[in-house]
From Swiss-Prot:
Alphabetical keyword list: Hydrolase, Metal-binding, Zinc
Reaction it catalyzes: a D-aminoacyl-tRNA + H2O = a tRNA + a D-alpha-amino acid + H(+); glycyl-tRNA(Ala) + H2O = tRNA(Ala) + glycine + H(+)
Cofactor note: Binds 2 Zn(2+) ions per subunit.
Entry cofactors: Zn(2+)
Stated name of the protein: D-aminoacyl-tRNA deacylase
Name of the gene: dtdA
GO molecular function: D-aminoacyl-tRNA deacylase activity; zinc ion binding
Family indicated by similarity: Belongs to the DtdA deacylase family.
UniProt-listed HAMAP family: Deacylase_DtdA (MF_00562)
Length: 272
């Protein structure tokens, strides 16, 4: 089963949940998760928790334990917060390049599903009649301890946007589209290195070419160790074809390490 994860402590999450139930024919069944009703349509279920999702390590196991459902992928419907309060629709995989300040474990990465996140970007960009930014975010926050692929899809970046009905509709429609299509999509898969948190060059590449990114390690996470880059490749559900480097947006030692790893593994090295 494909899982859409929502939480009562997040206005954007509840907005998206409401639009999914209203617009896509989800029906309440007899199951409960964390004491909350489960909604199902075909092979997709909507689950709701009462806590912040970024701290929910082992969520996939909790789902199976409480409901008997074995998730194949988890889409976290969430808010995005930023000091700039930039109106945005974003997607990313979770994990920590360094210390676990906001959930997960230190230097631990969740399993990325690049095709799902690329489809999310493309669909949100297509539906975006709000004039908001649509972009990847770099890999950050938890949960990192999940045994199935997952991604966050977010409405940002202040309460005004979190409760925006149209934003909720866009993200709800995008989630359904992604879950219906990601398994049948073939893209060139890359691990991204460099740039800022909102990964502008990686976002542009994903929107304009066949590249699909999994983990993205921004410049603020550099210097990046070889071990973590190898972990990012390993923690990708699809075969990785390339290592992509935002050249000016990366530190020198990380650039050279990435090039060496690409050569060692026989991957394409893309310098942008």
């Amino acid at each position: 089963m494909k899982v859409v994860m929502t939480t009562k402590v997040d206005l954007a999450s509840m907005n998206i949940r409401e639009k999914l139930i209203e617009n896509f024919g989800f029906k309440e069944d007899e199951l409960l998760f964390d004491g909350n009703p489960v909604y199902q349509k075909d092979d997709v279920v909507i689950l709701t928790t009462n806590q912040e999702m970024i701290y929910y390590d082992g969520l996939d196991r909790a789902i199976e334990r409480q409901t008997g459902i074995k998730p194949e992928i988890i889409a976290f419907a969430s808010r995005h917060s930023s000091k700039q309060k930039l109106p945005a629709l974003t997607t990313h995989v979770t994990g920590n390049w360094g210390g676990a300040l906001y959930g997960g474990k230190d230097e631990s990465l969740a399993i990325a599903q690049p095709s799902a996140m690329k489809l999310a970007l493309l669909k949100m960009n297509e539906l975006n009649d709000l004039g908001w930014t649509v972009c990847y975010e770099a890999t950050h926050h938890g949960p990192s301890e999940l045994d199935v692929p997952s991604f966050f899809i977010e409405i940002g970046s202040s309460e005004e946007e979190w409760v925006n009905d149209r934003a909720g509709e866009i993200v709800a429609e995008t989630i359904i589209y992604v879950l219906e299509n990601y398994q049948n999509s073939k893209f060139k898969v890359a691990v991204g290195i460099g740039g800022g948190h909102y990964a502008p060059k990686q976002t542009k590449r994903a929107l304009q070419t066949d590249l699909a990114f999994g983990h993205i390690a921004p410049k603020y996470a550099h210097p990046l160790s070889k071990e973590l880059l190898l972990k990012a490749i390993e923690r990708t559900a699809e075969r990785v074809d390339a290592i992509y480097v935002d050249w000016k947006g990366s530190k020198g030692e990380t650039r050279q390490m990435a090039r060496a790893v690409a050569e060692e593994l026989g991957l394409e090295f893309i310098r942008d």
